[in-house]
C-alpha cells in the first residue's frame, strides 16, 4: 500500500499558523510515502510568502518526507506586472523548486505533476502541447501494473463549486488534455484550486474521458474558505491502480481528524464507491456523502 498525502492551496500570507503547525505535525507523525502539494503555496507570490512556504516545505524535507510540489495561479505575481509577464514563476523557482513538472516513481506508483499556472490569466489555467507530449512520454515506459497519477493545480474537468449549483471552468485546452491523460493511462488525477473536496469518475464527466478517478483537495491551511467548507487535505491509500482508499482529513477548529473515509474500486462498469466510515460530521461537510461526486 502506498500512502499519499495530498495537500493544496496553502496560501501562505493568508494562512492560519495553528493549522500550518497542525498539518506539519500530522504529516510527521504518519510519514506518508509521498506528500503531494498541488499549487497555490502563496497568496500573492510575494517574497515573504515564498520564504514562509519554503521554510515549511524544507522542514518536511529535512524530516525525510519525499515531496512532489507544483505551482498554482497564486504563485504568479498579480500586481507586479514586470515579473508577471517576464518572469512569472521566478520566485517559485528560487524558493520552492526549479522543476515545474516533477516526476516521482517507485515500485508501485508513477506520479507526474504539470504546471497549469499562466501569466496571461488571473485565475484560470491551461496545459500546452509540450506538456501533453511530456505526459504521454513520461508514462510510456511505466510498467502496466503501476498506478499512474497526474497532479495539476487546475482540474481537467469543470467542477461544482457553489451551493447554488455553479460550475467552474475546465482547464484550458480541456479536450486535448483529457485525451492525453486517457492515452497515458492515468488512473488518478489530483488537483486543487477551488478550495473544495470532490471526487468523481472522469467517464461520468465527459465522453471518452478514460478511466481516471478525479480527486479534488480543499484548502489545507488558508483562511480563504469556500461555502464555509473547513480546511482539509486528502489521505490516500493506493492498494492497486483499481483500488484506493480516500480519507478527507478535516480541521475541526482544534485539530485535524478524519472527516470521511471512502473506498473506490474500478469494476467493469467503472469506479464504484462505498463509505468505510460514517459520512462527515464536520462543518460544511456535515450530512453530505463522503464522496462528493457521483461515482
Features from the language model and the residues they span:
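N-terminal active-site segment of His-dependent metallophosphoesterases
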Residues: 1-59, 79, 100
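Active-site environment of divalent metal-dependent phosphoester hydrolases
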Residues: 13-18, 43-47, 70-81, 119-123, ...
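Beta-strand-turn-beta hairpins that frame and shape the catalytic cleft
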Residues: 1-5, 102-113, 143-147, 208-213
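Conserved beta-sheet core of the metallophosphoesterase superfamily
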Residues: 165-242
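Short acidic, glycine-rich surface-loop motifs adjacent to enzyme active sites
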Residues: 143-161
Amino acid at each position: 500500500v502506498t500512502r499519499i498525502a495530498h495537500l493544496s492551496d496553502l496560501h501562505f500570507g493568508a494562512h492560519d499558523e495553528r493549522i500550518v503547525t497542525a498539518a506539519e505535525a500530522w504529516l510527521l507523525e504518519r510519514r506518508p510515502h509521498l506528500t503531494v502539494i498541488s499549487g497555490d503555496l502563496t497568496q500573492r507570490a510575494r517574497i515573504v510568502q515564498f520564504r514562509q512556504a519554503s521554510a515549511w516545505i524544507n522542514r518536511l524535507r529535512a524530516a525525510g518526507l519525499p515531496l512532489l510540489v507544483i505551482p498554482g495561479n497564486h504563485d504568479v505575481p498579480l500586481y507586479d506586472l514586470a515579473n508577471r509577464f517576464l518572469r512569472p514563476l521566478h520566485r517559485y523557482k528560487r524558493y520552492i523548486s526549479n522543476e515545474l513538472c516533477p516526476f516521482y516513481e517507485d515500485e508501485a506508483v508513477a506520479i507526474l505533476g504539470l504546471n497549469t499556472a499562466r501569466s496571461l490569466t488571473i485565475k484560470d489555467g491551461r496545459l500546452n502541447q509540450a506538456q501533453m507530449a511530456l505526459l504521454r512520454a513520461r508514462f510510456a515506459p511505466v510498467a502496466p501494473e503501476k498506478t499512474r497519477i497526474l497532479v495539476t493545480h487546475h482540474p481537467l474537468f469543470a467542477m461544482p463549486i457553489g451551493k447554488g449549483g455553479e460550475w467552474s471552468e475546465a482547464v484550458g485546452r480541456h479536450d486535448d488534455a483529457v485525451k492525453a491523460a486517457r492515452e497515458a493511462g492515468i488512473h488518478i488525477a489530483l488537483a486543487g484550486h477551488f478550495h473544495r473536496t470532490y471526487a468523481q469518475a472522469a467517464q461520468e464527466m465527459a465522453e471518452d474521458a478514460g478511466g481516471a478517478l478525479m480527486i479534488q483537495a480543499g484548502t489545507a491551511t488558508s483562511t480563504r474558505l469556500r461555502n464555509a467548507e473547513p480546511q482539509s487535505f486528502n489521505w490516500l491509500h493506493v492498494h492497486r491502480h483499481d483500488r484506493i482508499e480516500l480519507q478527507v482529513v478535516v480541521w475541526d477548529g482544534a485539530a485535524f481528524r478524519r472527516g470521511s473515509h471512502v473506498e473506490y474500486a474500478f469494476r467493469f462498469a467503472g469506479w464504484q464507491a462505498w463509505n468505510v466510515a460514517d459520512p462527515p460530521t464536520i462543518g460544511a461537510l456535515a450530512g453530505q456523502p463522503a464522496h462528493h461526486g457521483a461515482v
